[in-house]
Amino acid sequence: MKVSTAITGLLFLLVLNMLLGAEEIPKFGKVSDEELQMTAIPEDPEADAVVLFDVGDLRIREGSEKYYLTMERHTRVKILTEKGKDYASVSIPFWHEDRIHDLKAHTVLPNGKKIKMDKKAVFEEKVDKTGYKKFALPGVEVGAVIEYTYKLESDYLYNLEPWFFQNNEFTRLSQYSVIVLPYFGYSVFFRNTLDMEPETEDILDPQQRRKLTRYIWRMKDQPPIRKEPYMRTLNDYRAAINFQIREFKSPYAYHKYISDWPDLVKEMREHYDRNLDDDKSLKEIVQSEAPDSLRAPERIKKLYAFVRDQIETGERGYRAVEKSPEEVLKDRQGTGVEKNLLLVNLLMLAGFDAHPLLISTRYNGRIVEQQPRLTQFNYMLAYAKYGSRTYVLDTRYSYCPFNLLPVDDLVETGLVINKGTGGFIQIPKPRALNMLHCANNLTLSEAGHLDGEAMVRFEG
């Protein structure tokens, strides 16, 4: 399992330049004859395209009033088949408050002719808190090379931009570099790859007249990761690197951030506690919808049905909430997460052991429990216990029956955010009415043949 390491702005300062520096990346528009004449690659002869290189350079900068980060990305792809032309349609995701600018893209035909993308071809879409910059490169044909570059700017320094070293097609070179200021310390998490020691370069910050370190992670000749049946998300399988702030230490201030699961639980509990309350209107709902005269399971069911049916669902929501349960009740509208926190609040006022439960939905990927990383979670459910029974509830969809979760919530584990150190729980599986069991005992021969026996059992 991948274990976190740490970097700071001055880490490895004494061993600078002992390792090789970053590879020389061709400038935008400088496409070689070899790239133009390529018709296939020996590593993947059936490939529809090949990622010639995908390079990201991230840097934390110090402005006059704030710190911020910039990330410059440069991607070049060779189109090998008709199907490969689909890669000319590009979608760049970004957090809704981030900015993308200096976007350039063009197509280089096999004869060397360049077709520049019109800036009017770029448009933007938003889904919940995520934006997408979308465009289609012009004049793409088999044998062409497509290339684009852009800059992302963000004020969000808690988690640096993650990086995936693998794509849907074979990747010749994937490289990510990070420059942080001396005040910042980050934990580094690897997934689906062995931990990599970064290469380092010594650079000069001309504004502050100080030395900084550029950390470089590079992977070459990476096989493609393609969508397969029953696969939740490609991100469960792609080699990746993630960053989460560990500390900030300047001459004037010091702040310690998340370093383990209890830290994470404490931080999120403080956020939710700031919104939980015992407002009169909430108590009145408990008394009217779930009086003490009802049995406990029925009270839980009644409160669930009230929030599900009487509060309109806006966006899906993320981990955090912007409106308190009192405000959600007053507006009769909230995100899925805000509705679930309202349910938690009502259950607590009704005397139940109830807490927020963080999960990573199916499309977001599986949780790595050895990595205390907040960005692994993208949604929050309501969790309650009564006696030996556990209830995990999501009020987002009006069609969802009591104690039955929507498909995207059907994951293995969730993190209980209680007033202690929290902990992972197994999310109850729905009762199966029909089931198919398959068991195979197979032997793979040196010639590549599978021999053995299979047993199939139907139930229900």
For the regions a language model picked out, list residue spans one by one.
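A surface-exposed beta-strand-loop module
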Residues: 103-164, 200-238, 439-441
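Short, conserved helix/loop micro-motifs enriched in His/Cys and acidic residues
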Residues: 312-334
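Early extracytoplasmic/domain-onset interaction patches
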Residues: 23-92, 429-458
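Hydrophobic/aromatic-rich core segments of domains that either
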Residues: 337-428
